Amino acid sequence: MKRTLKILLCAALTAAICIPVLADVPATSSGLVATSAILSATEHSGETDVTADLLDGNTATAWVRTSPAAPDLSLALSGASVGEIWIRSGYCYNQNYYNSYDRPATVAVTIWYAYGQQSVTYRYTLSDAFLPTTSSADWSNGYQRLLLPEEYTGVTQVDLTIETVYAGRGNAGAAISDIALAADVHATATPR
């Protein structure tokens, strides 16, 4: 059964372009944090469309890795600009769900840019914290920021591979509640 993506807000980049925006993700220097025209999110273990669970901004839904395939997820885009990725790691419905499932510890992010002609991969270490109330340049509303060293244009795909996990207490599979991509930012840090 295929579910459709619910767009929470819509903000205009230009008079002609309207992109979905997650309501509880922080604004960038340009005032927009968007899913950057993400067309779909695909889990590679079974080529399953998981767009609704990853892009709905709802902590009651999550994508859970069913097998250690590489890459775990692919986000298809339509030539967008991407400068950072915001991720809610774990199944964030409540503290019990969060502790039950594995959470990504180290992730590899591959950016396919220049309209699919080039790619680059970065590795990030995520913190293990259930919806922290901290608000900073790297945290907001439970989202952690993965800042790319530069903004990439013509991005057609973002692959995410979970390399290591923080172990959960029972349920199998690493969970991610939500992902958002931000454009029009100026990178000021290197990957952690």
PLM features: residue spans?
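Bacterial N-terminal signal peptides that target proteins for export
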Residues: M1-L8
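Trp- and acidic/polar-enriched beta-sheet ligand-binding modules for extracellular glycan
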Residues: S67-D72, Y93-A187, P191
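Bacterial N-terminal signal peptides
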Residues: C10-P20
